[in-house]
Amino acid sequence: MSDKKEFKAESKRLLDLMINSIYTHKEIFLRELISNASDASDKLYYKALQENISGFSREDMAINLIVDKENRTLTIADEGIGMNKEELEEHLGTIANSGSFEFKNALEKGVSDVDIIGQFGVGFYSAFMVADEVDVYSKKYGEDKGYLWKSDTSDGYTIEEAEKATHGTTIVLHLKKDTEEEDYSKYLDQYEIERLVKKYSDYVHYPIKMDVTTSRKKEDSDEYEDVVENKTLNSQVPLWKRQKKDITKEEYDEFYKAKFNDFEAPQRVMHNTVEGAVSYTSLLFIPSKTPMNYYSQDYKKGLQLYSRGVFIMDHAEDLVPEHFRFVKGLVDSQDLNLNISREMLQHDRKMKVMANKIEKRIQTELENMLKDDRDEYVTFFKNFGMQLKFGIYNSYGMLKDKLQDLLMFYSSDKKELITLKEYVEAMPEGQKEIYFASGETIEKCDLLPQVESVKSKGYDVLYMTDNVDEFCLQMMRDYDSKTFKNVTQGDLDLETEDEKKELEQKTEDNKTLLEIVKKALGDKVQDVKLSHRLKSHPVCLASGDGVSFEMEKVLNQMPDAQGVKAGRILEINPDHDLFKSLQSVYEKEPVKIDEYASILFDQALLIAGFSIDDPVEFSNKITKLMIEASK
């Protein structure tokens, strides 16, 4: 007897997408099921090596495809490690834990069904794109009982004991009926199956076998007869072991999509064979888009690790540095012990040698991309540039020399992303610092009053729009001996000597007024002063030399926020008509100074991107002033 169990919510949603899919690449189901069969075979082979199981040969293992046109079934059978009842429920009843978080996020963000299938419609569930019923017979290696997992809808599934002679997993797909839009019968055609295996799974290092009917002449006769032979459909040569010159872009793309569960072709491929004290082959990919889960805890960095073509582990983290964690791929070395553990890898000298060379290879690839294909590098940087910045920040600046020339920031002058080297080379004579402004968007940076002032001097301003930007620059300290200067922080020292003297005189003349405004604002500000930093704007906020305004915002968004607050200095434009109005109020109606001071401070807060304490009160004060002005 078997009890029907319901799929978990995320699994049901994904199954609904599969069952009702308009996805045009339904044929990938075979790629995914063969890939699973290969993984199961790898696991058993690895177990046999670790436990010295006698009488076990990898050459005896195969993946078998069985076509039954009469019953409209396609079967994929392996002789791998198999699953017991608990594992069937864990692996087939729910989305793998590593995928559930980002799947939920994708649904919440309203990502299209097609894109969701492209991201998550991989592995076993893809079978439901072509089948309306799926039977999975499995028996785990070393155990006596076999089980049947069965589902014909997205509502649920059953698991019951079943006879199975050998270990491994057999998946029987009951294909959907043909429709006007879809021809499911083609997956019962031997030539179509051969084509799909050749296209997607040729590199699988277990023979993929199928009974194939061919026609040949009878002996001593002109008549033909049909002959059935069990044919191996794949070459079994791993892609990375072939010569680069013999591999097409399409082959690299299809391998990447199949191996690393990506819907898109990679942006860049790095295929290298290294001979020396440690010999290895690496096949590395830079994805063309940022994975949905890239900035979540679910994302796992690292490369697949092989030894002499035998799979060892999925995420060898030590092979790729944190600042290049976006790189996917694999490494195959004949110099590694097959029984090496994850703990031993951390201290293995050969692993460290490979890791250093792989890091240099990625670094060189990015440098060449920036030099030879600017547009492609800009695309890459928009996807993964933040990771390079985090690399400098997380290393406390230790990686500055390696990564600084790969960074790009938006230029107020060029209206595009530029490198720090390009900024410095374009600096006019007399400019001593690299000016930058921080904000949520380029548009908000562009509107800052302080930016206007710096641009009026003919200086370019770099816009920092990522949360990590200022923290990264803080760790770098300088570039090419030029220090970084936040235009909203401290004294910019852009005035001529005459302008400085003029400002000193105006400050002295209005000393009492400024003191009254400061007193009115109390502990909201550190200081109130006149400034030549402003051109067309009446007021702005500047921060002291400690935490900047954007750093304050970022730090206060963190879970353990301590209420960090940057020092606020209210700067007033002495040449603006509003200041003249303030002077007039001070002379004629000094009791109103407190109200004017409050309005000016709230204005400055809004310009700097902060919220104000009481928007209603601010609105009422503005309304009152407008009414008084009309009288």
Q: What positions do the PLM features span?
A:
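GHKL (Bergerat-fold) ATPase N-terminal catalytic module, capturing the glycine-rich phosphate-binding loop
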Residues: M1-Q190, R195
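GHKL/Bergerat-fold ATPase module in large chromosome/replication-associated machines
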Residues: I116, V134-G156, K176-K186, Y191-K631
